[in-house]
Amino acid sequence: MNYTTQMDAARKGIITKEMEIVSQKEQVDVNELRELIANGQVVIPANKNHKSLSAEGVGKNLRTKINVNLGISRDCKDIEKELEKVRVAIDMKAEAIMDLSNYGKTREFREKVVEMSPAMIGSVPMYDAVGYLEKELKDITEEEFLNVIRQHAIDGVDFITIHAGLTRSVCQKIKNHERLTHIVSRGGSLLFAWMELNNKENPIYTNFDKILDICEEYDVTLSLGDACRPGCIKDSTDGVQIQELVVLGELTKRAWERNVQVMIEGPGHMAIDEIEANVVLEKRLCHGAPFYVLGPLVTDIAPGYDHITSAIGGALACAKGVDFLCYVTPAEHLRLPNLDDMKEGIIAAKIAAHAGDIAKNVKGAREWDNKMSKARADLDWCEMFRLAIDPEKAKRYRDESTPTHEDSCTMCGKMCSMRTVKKILNNEELNLI
């Protein structure tokens, strides 16, 4: 193999098997796709050691992808329960799964996830450094942080979140700034604490070139995390957030010089009127790199319903150019999600992604809706269920309330508008009584 990474291959004019797979899935010209990868506007996270991967592309002119978070923790360390979540995520066709494990047999779990998953796998090595090493945060060395990152790469993780933009100068602004929620990124807060406890610069920032060595060797995509993402709408689009984004833009260029693929992570909590400006800022400051957002959640008052607040923001964000959505479940801010929460979160994220794809005129997006509309006009219930984003729920709802006439539902019965117009146009007897 005479290339190191997907970006290196693209710049050398080589079309990889992963590019061919993505081209077929997306119905886009493979040479146009290669050009987008070469200039950093599309990434194909594909670790050389992830043998079960079915490659996906993230970025310009492609379908918006969704990610599912899971993993073992001190309070919920049942590996089998989390592996069942992996199976559900795969069955529901999530394109990415992030293992956020931070306690116990993290490597054993990670290896199983990579082995069984055709979805691209992401991780946050910072979490693992604390849980796996079983050391006090202050005592973890820079070399140990790098060793954990290398282990994740060896194990086949396709993309890693690192909070390299949280520099000492950014931290100083956080300390001087009147933020309501300070740092809500778990990895970011751990790094902030390490820096303060050791009175040192961010080790992920100072060792960035060594991390690029690892990513280049295994073709790991960098997901540059936003440690300073807003945790409430009051903190959104402030100086702290933007200062970190500027640093991420600089790091993006450094990664590209080494042919390492990059995504940029984004908010977070954000009022709906600020979403478009934030997408424009990321695309400008980070040179068109794919944008990966958590939400954004457009209001802070809805615990138990944050899959909805997230879907509202996510749909608008995608419409304005976001490329990748991290799902949010009804359990957000409350507890670890269970399987039902997961399913709700996946469906909400998929709806938001699809709504955004319609606005972006992504190939095939509108056709799906048109087929559903045709099935409704024809009162073809079997076809409606087949096309539904959640066929199981749609069929269950209909079965729970069976109409007298099979060509209608219990909302309108014989007064169904589709039924009425269809009968009139076909010169059939109407019979509303």
Curated annotation (Swiss-Prot):
Record keyword Zinc present: yes
Required co-factors: [4Fe-4S] cluster
Pathway connected to this protein: Cofactor biosynthesis; thiamine diphosphate biosynthesis
GO biological process, one term: thiamine biosynthetic process
Annotated catalysed reactions: 5-amino-1-(5-phospho-beta-D-ribosyl)imidazole + S-adenosyl-L-methionine = 4-amino-2-methyl-5-(phosphooxymethyl)pyrimidine + CO + 5'-deoxyadenosine + formate + L-methionine + 3 H(+)
Gene3D superfamilies for this protein: 6.10.250.620, Radical SAM ThiC family, central domain (3.20.20.540)
EC numbers for this chain: 4.1.99.17
InterPro entries referenced in this protein's UniProt entry, alphabetically: ThiC, ThiC/Bza_core_dom, ThiC/BzaA/B
One Pfam family from the record: ThiC_Rad_SAM
Protein family membership: Belongs to the ThiC family.
Function, as annotated: Catalyzes the synthesis of the hydroxymethylpyrimidine phosphate (HMP-P) moiety of thiamine from aminoimidazole ribotide (AIR) in a radical S-adenosyl-L-methionine (SAM)-dependent reaction.
Protein name as catalogued: Phosphomethylpyrimidine synthase
